[in-house]
Regions:
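Aromatic-residue-lined binding/catalytic grooves and analogous aromatic/hydrophobic interfacial grooves
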Residues: 200-611
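Lectin-like carbohydrate-binding module/patch detector with strong preference for beta-trefoil
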Residues: 1-200
Length: 611
């Protein structure tokens, strides 16, 4: 499993080792299983080597106060004190008083107290969590326990059991009240994020997009599901939150699935569409940012972030190339030597990450992984994966720092080429083949992209995308796109010209999403297209056959994107006419000897549930 990977066994002669039994998530029991199983493997990481964000805080003392944002995992909202003796609320970093959102933590006899930088003490008042300048000590003591929710993190409570854990009351959202609910609820789970990891921004006042059909925003995203910006080449893609301090390039490949091969099974066993990984690009030396804008240009299929800091204009550009099969990230600045970043690549499925710097002042980050799968007879055949990221700069230096990760110093510009792929093979009996070739394929892809160069890569991407996107045009009015997209949505009922443009923009966004999620491998876009930020997504982010997968393709024929139907149609033909499982479903479910059928919930391996 690589250098630095271990298994813990009762003794050296025992054939079993410590294992994550059943599902891989917080709160699962730890048991024993055969040595060599991927779910045994662990590494030892010191607290000082942990990357942002931390889950547990450093305890403050009078001489050394350490402040954190307390961030809810659902929605990424921050715990904020409001007025004196008022109920606390979830808040956005970019709305409100930062001193009300920063907290230091003290501990005594296993109980914890929280004081904001503005001097307000967290306390319990009836069924709510309040903050005030002064309170009776007995009301200010809380517990902290590790959550058993799949999100992973900490829950703050007034005891260690029962309906006593701080919760975003009536759902996640800015301005909600903080109350209490059962341990394990997704609205409870928090992490402690160091103050320097989040940077406040002020948005740009005027912005004229290069192209009319552009989604644009004046603050970073705080909620992945509702606010991230997706890019994709039809099979491999990424989502972008636009944070200036830690740029999270979360990426997916349509073929990375856990679960069962063929046959009907329970909802728990047919698997999940998985998060492939996260490339964290941390910009060092950050201070307050102005003129911030993030955007998704759907005319050219390119996303970006622009901002100003200390008089320097910074720009970040992102696109997913179909011709060159990779995601590309580029950083530039208006002054030379201003790009200073640290890279951390997170493998979300269990293998070590390798960081190397070559003699040409260029860096490569790689990892390999395996995902557990099981057939009807209980035999396990893993799906393998591999990822490579190539980092090149104009000027500056690239080194491995003391923590062993990649650091860029004093660059004029920086470009990253990223690819993750699996050994999924829809024509193979076990749906996989060629695992031993994956690392070489990933490396060849990013090296080929680097050799081609950024300008040629972007030109090829743009030509390829526009050959599809430009086939259809809908014009409902002559309106300039000079209003941020959230404001365009909120004013939809009030301005006829703007609401016509929103409909025009929405129409084209649907076509963009289909182009970005239905090319390459013969699999349809799933419930979330190709985008997914966790390993236990809603409805497994599956191929939902009652109506959802059909809806993905409603724009295909009417808007002249007919060939984007091919991955879906090829998937149906393969599973219905070539593979045996869907014909067996007709016998087992419909008690007929001819024809085929499929269940509502389906994975990519021909399996589905009895739901």
């Amino acid at each position: 499993f690589g250098t630095g990977a271990f298994e813990l066994a009762p003794d050296s002669t025992n054939s079993h080792a410590m294992n994550q039994v059943g599902e891989i998530r917080a709160g699962q029991e730890i048991g024993l299983w055969d040595k060599g199983d991927i779910n045994n493997v662990l590494t030892f990481v010191s607290k000082d080597d942990m990357e942002f964000p931390y889950y547990m805080p450093v305890i403050s003392t009078a001489a050394n106060p350490v402040y954190y944002y307390i961030q809810f995992q659902t929605g990424n909202w921050l715990l904020s004190a409001k007025g004196d003796k008022e109920t606390c609320q979830p808040a956005s970093l970019h709305n409100g008083n930062l001193d009300d959102m920063l907290w230091r933590v003290s501990e005594k006899d296993g109980k914890y107290s929280f004081v904001s930088k503005s001097g307000k003490i967290l306390y319990i008042s009836d069924s709510y969590v309040n903050a005030a300048k002064a309170r009776n000590v007995k009301d200010t003591l809380f517990t902290m326990v590790e959550s058993n929710n799949a999100l992973g993190g900490i829950e703050i409570g007034k005891s260690t059991t029962g309906r006593n854990f701080c919760n975003m009351f009536q759902g996640a959202g800015e301005g909600r009240l903080i109350s209490f609910w059962d341990l394990g609820d997704g609205g409870n789970v928090v992490r402690f994020v160091p103050a320097e990891a989040l940077v406040p921004v002020s948005g740009i006042t005027t912005f004229n997009p290069a192209n009319k059909y552009t989604l644009w925003y004046t603050k970073p995203a705080t909620n992945w599901m509702t606010s991230c910006l997706p890019i994709g080449n039809g099979q491999f893609g990424a989502t972008l939150m636009g944070d200036v301090a830690i740029d999270d390039v979360q990426f997916n490949d349509k073929t990375l699935w856990s679960g069962k091969l063929g046959g009907l099974t329970s909802t728990a066993a047919y698997g999940y569409y998985l998060n492939f990984g996260n490339l964290y690009i941390r910009s060092r030396g950050m201070s307050k940012v102005t003129d911030y804008v993030r955007y998704l240009d759907i005319n050219d299929a390119v996303a970006g972030v622009k901002y100003t800091m200390d008089g320097v204009a910074y720009s970040r550009t992102y696109f997913a190339s179909n011709p060159d099969s990779c995601v590309v990230v580029r950083y530039t600045a208006s002054q030379n030597g201003k790009i200073n970043t640290t890279f951390t690549l997170k493998n979300q499925n269990g293998r070590n990450v390798s960081y190397t710097v070559d003699n040409n002042n260029q860096a490569t980050i790689t990892f390999d992984g395996q995902v557990a799968r099981q057939d009807d007879h209980g035999a396990t055949t893993p799906e393998s994966s591999s990822c490579a990221a190539r980092i090149v700069t104009d000027g500056g230096t690239i080194t491995k720092n003391a923590k062993g990760v990649i650091e860029v110093n004093g660059a004029n510009s920086m470009t990253v080429y990223l690819r993750g792929l699996t050994d999924f093979d829809p024509d193979a009996p076990t749906y996989v083949s060629g695992a031993n070739l994956l690392a070489g394929r990933a490396a060849a892809t990013v090296n080929g992209a680097q050799n081609k160069g950024y300008d040629a890569l972007f030109a090829a991407h743009k030509t390829d995308y526009k050959s599809l996107f430009d086939r259809c045009q809908l014009t409902l009015g002559d309106v300039k796109n000079n209003i941020p997209t959230p404001q365009l949505i909120s004013s939809y009922r009030d301005n006829q010209q703007d609401n016509l443009f929103l409909e025009e923009l929405y129409f084209n966004y649907g076509r963009y999403l289909l182009i970005s999620s239905s090319r390459g491998v013969s699999l349809p876009a799933n419930l979330q297209g190709i985008w997914n930020d966790n390993n236990t997504p809603a409805w497994h982010s599956d191929i939902h056959a009652n109506i959802n997968v059909q809806m993905n393709y409603w724009p295909a024929e009417p808007t002249n994107l007919s060939e984007l139907h091919r991955p879906f149609l090829d998937y149906i033909y393969r599973e219905a006419c070539v593979k045996p499982t869907w014909r067996r479903f007709a016998q087992d479910m419909g008690h007929v000897n001819t024809g085929w059928t499929l269940p509502t919930e389906n994975n990519i391996y021909g399996s589905g549930t009895t739901f």
